[in-house]
Amino acid sequence: MGSRFLLALFLVLLVLGCEVQAAQQLQQDDPGSPALLDKVQESISSYWDTAKAAAQGLYQKTYLTSVDEKLRDMYSKSSAAMTTYASIFTDQIFTLLKGE
């Protein structure tokens, strides 16, 4: 899920970067055209809205409640086990250092 989000974010940034670069080239050709600037802003806004909707759709499509609950349960059990084993290990180290 995280890698898909990063991929979508990368694609959005790539599209925006290409759009900005094209806008800069067009702006250098005709710097006094406000209509061109409006078109570029609308284009960037539409690309952003499309990418945002696609990312939200992808997130909602891949989100599974049962998997989320299983992951939370596995995390809580494994962290409880690690806490127990860390306590035992710490106790053993103290016993070795104290010499009893």
Curated annotation (Swiss-Prot):
Q: Please tell me one Gene Ontology term that the record gives under cellular component.
A: chylomicron
UniProtKB keywords: Chylomicron, HDL, LDL, Lipid degradation, Lipid metabolism, Lipid transport, Secreted, Signal, Transport, VLDL
Give a yes or no for keyword Methyltransferase in this entry: no
Gene (UniProt): APOC2
Q: What Pfam families does this protein's entry cite?
A: Apo-CII
- Where do the record's region annotations for Lipid binding lie? 66-74
Q: For the region Lipoprotein lipase cofactor, what residue ranges are annotated?
A: 78-100
Q: Which Gene3D superfamilies match?
A: Apolipoprotein C-II
What is a single molecular function from GO for this protein? phospholipase binding
Family statement drawn from the similarity comment of this UniProt entry: Belongs to the apolipoprotein C2 family.
Domain of life assignment: Eukaryota
* Gene Ontology process terms (BP): lipid catabolic process; lipid transport; positive regulation of phospholipid catabolic process
Q: Which organism is it from?
A: Bramus lutescens
Checking InterPro entries in the record gives:
Apo-CII, ApoC-II_dom_sf
Protein name, as recorded: Apolipoprotein C-II
Please state the span of the N-terminal signal peptide per the UniProt entry.
1-22
Q: How is it modified after translation?
A: Proapolipoprotein C-II is synthesized as a sialic acid containing glycoprotein which is subsequently desialylated prior to its proteolytic processing.
- UniProt xrefs under PANTHER family: APOLIPOPROTEIN C-II
Record has Nucleotide-binding as a keyword: no
Q: Where are the transmembrane segments?
A: none
State the compartments where it is located: Secreted
Task: Write out the function statement from the record.
Answer: Component of chylomicrons, very low-density lipoproteins (VLDL), low-density lipoproteins (LDL), and high-density lipoproteins (HDL) in plasma. Plays an important role in lipoprotein metabolism as an activator of lipoprotein lipase.
